[in-house]
Amino acid sequence: MRHRIAIAAALAATLLGAAACGGSDDTGANDTSAQALDGKGKTIKVWLMVDAQSAWKEVVEDANARFTAATGANVTVEYQQWANHLTKLDATLAGNDVPDVVELGNTEMPKYVFSGAFAELDKSRFENSANWLQGLSGPCELDGKTYCVPYYAGARVLIYRTDLFEAAGLKPPTSYAEVIAAADALKAKNGSSKKFAAFYMPGAYWYAAMSWVHAEGGQIAKKDGDKWVGTLSEPQAQAGLQKWADLVKNYSAGDVTKDENDHAAIFAQGESAMLYGHGWEVGATQEQRKDPNDPNSALVPTKVKGKVASAPMPGIPSFLGGSDLGVASKSQNQALAAEWIKYFTDTKSQEALLAKAVLPNATNLLDKAAAVKGNEATALAAKSSWFVPMAEKWADVEKASVLQQMLRDIVTGKKSVADAAAWGDAEIAKTLNG
């Protein structure tokens, strides 16, 4: 494989080594030496994931305003759902009416860079580029050239109801055994409601399930010679899957076939005590749009406003992921698209994101991230992390929902852990080696 994709250990080391990193000498979004772009009468189309709409829409709007003031061009932002965005992107890229800017997860980006879906970018034009996190910038680079720009990183944490913990005489758990003990106590105290979940865990939440797998020493797949083999059938991986499935069975509630896309909204209904989610979802559980179908409607407090906090999930390593932004090769507005990315990823935008409990795209900003109230748990969670297999076709595994289907088969009882893992291994190997 020609991609230089940073491994999880390198990303963790990058995060932990922030104090040793200096500032950037790169040309920034306020560079006045660059020739001004005239975008009057033009509109660029930006595809961002729904996270930005629900958690930091004001950051998007600020970048749009600064971009329009500088170029005269307008911006149309279309928010995408994680569940189907790759299928939609593939279909769109096959035609000519393509988005100018596309957000992809850092595990998804390599396939599209390798296939030529994104245009080459001048790395020096983006602020803090000398200090980009390797786990985000690695998937952007091919043969010494840059094809996307790091957007943000994040780690998952334990989100919990402070009022329910206090009523049960509990403190934030510091070991996995304490997590289970807390779940038992909360279930005993609040279990009269069939809707109550001591620990809400969607059954198709593969980022969570694979974290439990890694906690037991397992992994998803490994390279054997020149072939990939699935490793979910190995004893450690099965132990992690079983431990996770037991959590779902004993402490969750509701439709076990769901994924995590709306778990913050479900937690906000007030019937759950614990959740495993992004640091920024602490805020998403407490304020939501008055009209869920109108992203411009006012934010209103939920039932759990002021009753939610976060802590590192003890004993469970976090998937340390994030997103990158690319300019479509078929875009007719490549210069303007790159300019928009410049504003959306500059220091002003990144510092605004810190308040949302996400990690910035550059090491020189990490000290500021750790100092932001509410970001402490996310920064600590990043110290124990894992990453997906470094396979060029990994995005195809995600697109086919292989892990989600395997997990649904387990939690619905359709298959045993052993049988589901064997099926998953076969599908993963077939996809990665195809």
Residue ranges, per PLM feature:
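Glycine-centered hinge/linker elements that transmit conformational signals in sensory
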Residues: 183, 227-256
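C-terminal capping/gating helix-and-loop segments adjacent to ligand/active sites or protein-protein/ligand interfaces
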Residues: 356-360, 377-427
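Short, solvent-exposed loop/beta-turn-alpha elements that line the ligand-binding surface or hinge
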Residues: 38-40, 123-134, 191-192, 197-199, ...
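A structural signal for short loop-to-beta-strand junctions that line the ligand-binding cleft
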Residues: 99-100, 128-164, 197, 308-317, ...
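Extracytoplasmic/periplasmic substrate-binding proteins
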Residues: 49, 109, 242-332
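Extracytoplasmic/periplasmic solute-binding protein
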Residues: 147-150, 156, 180-229, 265, ...
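Conserved N-terminal structural module of periplasmic/extracytoplasmic solute-binding proteins
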Residues: 2-12, 18-111, 123-128, 256, ...
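Hinge/lid segment of periplasmic solute-binding proteins
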Residues: 38, 106-155, 180, 215, ...
